[in-house]
Amino acid sequence: MGIPVGKSLLMLFTFLAFASCCIAAYRPSETLCGGELVDTLQFVCGDRGFYFSRPASRINRRSRGIVEECCFRSCDLALLETYCATPAKSERDVSTPPTVLPDDSPRYPVVKLFQYNAWKQSTQRLRRGLPALLRTRRGRMLVKELEAFREAQRHRPLIALPTEDPTPHGAAFVEVSSDLQ
């Protein structure tokens, strides 16, 4: 009788799937220019970074840059990968053995010792700037007394209160204002 409809549809869909895969494989790749090219390179290369031109090889002295290849011709993933930079070795890369220092290196800690003479010269230089009166013990005491006196002068009260009661024998003092008269 013939082929059932279900099987024929299944075969048709299978054929279309294979045909679309083959067409996609042989069709020319898309072109990338400008910002799209840079974004795609950043996505493909990631942390490695990328170059716009490959190092010149001996075989092909005139190598085209990625802009010339991807913008004017077709560009695919394999071509983009060739422009990715090689990753630099990280500090945690333990695949290579660390360099061994020679054993004859001195093991003494590097310490800058206190130099008394330099300290003494700097204090003498400071003392030369001070007046002779302030360098003596008596002079320093006079300066402290002078500072205490000035501090007391700065904090004196605004109103001097009398020590005695101004009213004689408890008599009340009545002030008459000039407005009432």
Curated annotation (Swiss-Prot):
Transmembrane segments: none annotated. Residues 65-85 are annotated as: A. Keywords: Carbohydrate metabolism, Cleavage on pair of basic residues, Disulfide bond, Glucose metabolism, Glycoprotein, Growth factor, Hormone, Mitogen, Osteogenesis, Secreted, Signal. Residues 86-91 are annotated as: D. Belongs to the insulin family. Interacts with MYORG; this interaction is required for IGF2 secretion. Interacts with integrins ITGAV:ITGB3 and ITGA6:ITGB4; integrin-binding is required for IGF2 signaling. Interacts with IGFBP2. This is Insulin-like growth factor 2. The lineage of its organism: Eukaryota, Metazoa, Chordata, Craniata, Vertebrata.
